[in-house]
From Swiss-Prot:
InterPro entries: FMN-bd, Ion_transpt_RnfG/RsxG. This is Ion-translocating oxidoreductase complex subunit G. Pfam families: FMN_bind (PF04205). It is an enzyme of class 7 (translocase).
Amino acid sequence: MLDAIRKNGVTLAVFAAITTGLTAVINAVTKPTIEHQTAVQQKILLDQVVPPELYNNRIQDECYSVTDPALGNTNPHHLYLARKDDKPVAVALETTAPDGYSGNIQMIVGASFDGIVYGTRVVEHHETPGLGDKIELRISDWINSFNGKKVNGPSDGHFAVKKDGGDFDQFTGATITPRAVVNAVKRTTLYIETLPGQLSSLPTCGDANE
């Protein structure tokens, strides 16, 4: 009986070793493909918020970490710097709307250093399906209403939902969600205007405590 137990133990050990080895091989083979697909999707997202004709650097490789309450919390957010002939012209900046109806709304905002919004995308949210989820491009083109708009300072009343006297539509039965997004875009764009003097001192992604 002991011999049988030992034999089964050896068999299980060999099986475990083979399985572990196969898993390692599969991971090694698929990792480059996964990384490539992730990079492609990231570039597509960045080009949606900063038009590619505005820059000629590899924007996804110029990633910096920024932390500021204007971005919705004090967590590090990634900033992608767009350059034209080595001159900084715009950024795509991750940001958070902390006051969504169902919690945080994670976004990315592309803007120039003089307050012009190039594009905005929501990358994660938990808003109510059929109501607040109209902030998603696949459901509604509302998010494109920011394109080309300029934020004229902190007191710019146009940068608000219509219910608050601004220019942006709210959703039927859902004002909290679009209000949170509009306010986050405004705060983030105003913050981007302050960045030119800080760019040289920003930590690169991975160097900060993220």
